[in-house]
């Protein structure tokens, strides 16, 4: 059984102040895909769990096989269906990742602010994305676990500087407290919308997909 259970679709309109009658007038987008990348234990799965279920756990049953999660939200005048792909950080799974990058539209590269090595490895992940997708992708550099600020090894200024050098977006979050998690998804969805240079088909949707490949055994979300 997976960490997430089964596929779920969520409709979230309250945060955007929409009435039911207004939703019928909204346009939708073509398919896309959001991919989470980063080293093991940086909190990729925890961020997804916080966004999908508003929950956090330091230990849960390991994911076996593939999970698919989706969440539909309303942003500006568009319906955005987020389908999230979660990749395992273990070295044994790294050879699988390029095939999942190839059709991605958004890549979120995650590091742990209490682990300087995970921060150093973000260059590698961004290089992988650009090698497969060039400039046809939105990239967000994400520093997670800011609830552990007293153990911080990477400053926000260092994260911002690296994001400028790599020409990517930047944000810090806490999957544990939920700080900035919704903002993360709003920002990447907005960035995706801004890359659309022509009006999307009325019947389409933005789809950003999630698959997770995790090593068997106990793991930590923290």
Curated annotation (Swiss-Prot):
Gene Ontology cellular component list: cytosol; endomembrane system; Golgi apparatus; Golgi membrane; intracellular membrane-bounded organelle; plasma membrane
UniProt keyword NADP, yes or no: no
Region (Switch-II): 89-105
Reaction it catalyzes: GTP + H2O = GDP + phosphate + H(+)
GO biological process: intra-Golgi vesicle-mediated transport; intracellular protein transport; protein localization to Golgi membrane; retrograde transport, endosome to Golgi; retrograde vesicle-mediated transport, Golgi to endoplasmic reticulum
Coiled-coil boundaries: none
Tissue expression summary: Widely expressed in brain, testis, lung, heart, ovary, colon, kidney, uterus and spleen but not in liver.
S-geranylgeranyl cysteine lipid attachment residues: 222
UniProt-recorded Gene Ontology molecular function terms: GTP binding; GTPase activity
Localization: Cytoplasm
Record entry for activity regulation: Regulated by guanine nucleotide exchange factors (GEFs) which promote the exchange of bound GDP for free GTP. Regulated by GTPase activating proteins (GAPs) which increase the GTP hydrolysis activity. Inhibited by GDP dissociation inhibitors (GDIs).
Positions of Mg(2+) binding: 45, 63, 86
Chief site of localization: cytoplasm
The entry's keywords: Cytoplasm, GTP-binding, Hydrolase, Lipoprotein, Magnesium, Metal-binding, Nucleotide-binding, Prenylation
UniProt keyword ATP-binding, yes or no: no
Pfam family, one: Ras
Region of interest: Switch-I: 58-66
Needed cofactors: Mg(2+)
Binding site for GTP: 41-46, 63, 89, 144-145, 147, 174-176
Domain notes: Switch I, switch II and the interswitch regions are characteristic of Rab GTPases and mediate the interactions with Rab downstream effectors. The switch regions undergo conformational changes upon nucleotide binding which drives interaction with specific sets of effector proteins, with most effectors only binding to GTP-bound Rab.
Functional summary from the UniProt entry: The small GTPases Rab are key regulators of intracellular membrane trafficking, from the formation of transport vesicles to their fusion with membranes. Rabs cycle between an inactive GDP-bound form and an active GTP-bound form that is able to recruit to membranes different sets of downstream effectors directly responsible for vesicle formation, movement, tethering and fusion. RAB41 is required for normal Golgi ribbon organization and ER-to-Golgi trafficking.
Family listed: Belongs to the small GTPase superfamily. Rab family.
Name of protein: Ras-related protein Rab-41
Organism: Homo sapiens
Organism taxonomic ancestry: Eukaryota, Metazoa, Chordata, Craniata, Vertebrata
